[in-house]
């Protein structure tokens, strides 16, 4: 009965427009109050909500959000775009390849898909359209390339997943780096094919060693950040939380004193914006912790594990089923909400089937990113629409070849665990 109350209540509250975090908390409280078989007190929900945030790893989320906002406003994105363009040279579709590479570089700084779309799109979209690139294809490529944001570390969704499952944040970031490089290669290959098929323009800027070195030097402060973050974590010198705090300090130094495009007067609004974004994410995590605890306490998790195990599904088939479920939920729910709702339900089953926690984490992470590109809840498309001023339908039409490449690589990751684990 508790499970019916929880999921029916959660679905009903979402339908009538109640925020996700409140829906999780209210449905959990209602199940405790209405199911006579649940003997714990209602105030246990408050204890579990507090326990959901009582972790130093959770602090990394707020710091990474703040660091991403500081970098977006601090002039780093322009240096990243110039550096990416200096690498490509005058090939057909060169600016489109530049966009993909710029999104990959910026992803290693921000960890956010919408931030990547806005930061890179603001700089490159108008210039590409003036050069003769199709508006819909350019916007669509921006949407899908922005999906590198939560995959290439640092990644907020990976920190959330690691907190829920006990996985190593460092190992998640290593796997994410490998997956991110793979997706980048796939997108570049798709760009090359369509650049020749649709006769996209050649970049007028040819590769020049002097220009490359100048742009590289200008980009060093930006490129240093992922080295500091990932190097500190991989070497064991820093935890993810400590690295995220250092990322904030370095972002301030780069924006205020090196690039000088960030001003002290900007900081208050950046702090407020970051606090709001972090609070929404943390509230969802907190209430989902209580939801997941009651799910296990009522014995629903154990019953579900036994049911699936008795179906004799292979690990690959289960991973494929999970991928489809996550993609469906991601269409209607924001990415982190999908993860915090389903991971506590699905991970015990995956664990019973012997699925690697990092591989499962990559499935969850990539599926959540795909959700940012699929209407109606498609934050990447909304972000691209705000930059490009194009209608959503035109952006969706333009993104299909890149979206197919992204999703195709996702299913390869689902079925081939070594793609997730080769860097570990």
Where in this protein do the model-derived segments appear?
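Alpha-helical transmembrane segments of multi-pass membrane transport proteins
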Residues: 1-424
């Amino acid at each position: 009965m508790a499970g019916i109350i929880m999921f029916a209540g959660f679905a009903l509250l979402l339908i009538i427009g109640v925020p996700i975090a409140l829906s999780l908390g209210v449905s959990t409280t209602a199940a405790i109050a209405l199911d006579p078989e649940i003997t714990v007190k209602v105030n246990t929900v408050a204890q579990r909500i507090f326990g959901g945030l009582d972790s130093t790893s959770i602090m990394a989320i707020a710091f990474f959000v703040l660091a991403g906002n500081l970098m977006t406003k601090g002039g780093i994105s322009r240096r990243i775009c110039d550096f990416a363009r200096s690498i490509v040279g005058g090939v057909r579709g060169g600016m489109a390849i530049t966009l993909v590479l710029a999104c990959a570089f910026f992803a290693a700084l921000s960890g956010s898909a919408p931030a990547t779309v806005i930061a890179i799109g603001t700089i490159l979209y108008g210039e590409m359209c003036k050069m003769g690139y199709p508006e819909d294809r350019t916007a669509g490529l921006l949407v899908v390339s922005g999906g590198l944001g939560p995959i290439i570390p640092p990644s907020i969704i990976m920190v959330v997943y690691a907190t829920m499952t006990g996985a190593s944040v460092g190992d998640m970031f290593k796997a994410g780096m490998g997956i991110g490089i793979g997706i980048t290669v796939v997108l570049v290959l798709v760009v090359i094919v369509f650049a020749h098929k649709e006769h996209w323009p050649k970049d007028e800027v040819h590769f020049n060693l002097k220009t490359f070195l100048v742009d590289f030097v200008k980009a060093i402060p930006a490129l240093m950040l992922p080295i500091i973050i990932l190097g500190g974590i991989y070497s064991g010198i820093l935890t993810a939380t400590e690295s995220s705090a250092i990322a904030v300090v370095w972002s301030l130094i780069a924006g205020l004193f090196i690039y000088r495009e960030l001003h002290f007067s900007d900081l208050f609004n950046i702090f407020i914006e970051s606090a709001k974004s972090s609070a929404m994410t943390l509230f969802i995590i907190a209430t989902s912790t209580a939801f997941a605890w009651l799910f296990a306490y009522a014995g629903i998790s154990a019953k579900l594990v036994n049911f699936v195990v008795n179906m004799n599904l292979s690990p690959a088939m289960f991973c494929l089923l999970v991928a489809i479920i996550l993609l469906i939920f991601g269409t209607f729910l924001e990415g982190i909400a999908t993860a915090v709702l389903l991971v506590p339900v699905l991970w015990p089953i995956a664990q019973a089937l012997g699925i690697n926690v990092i591989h499962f984490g990559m499935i969850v992470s990539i599926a959540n990113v795909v959700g940012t590109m699929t209407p109606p809840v498609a934050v990447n498309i909304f972000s691209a629409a705000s930059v490009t001023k194009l209608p959503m339908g035109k952006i969706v039409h333009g993104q299909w070849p890149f979206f197919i490449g992204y999703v195709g690589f996702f299913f390869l990751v689902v079925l081939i665990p070594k793609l997730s684990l080769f860097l570990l």
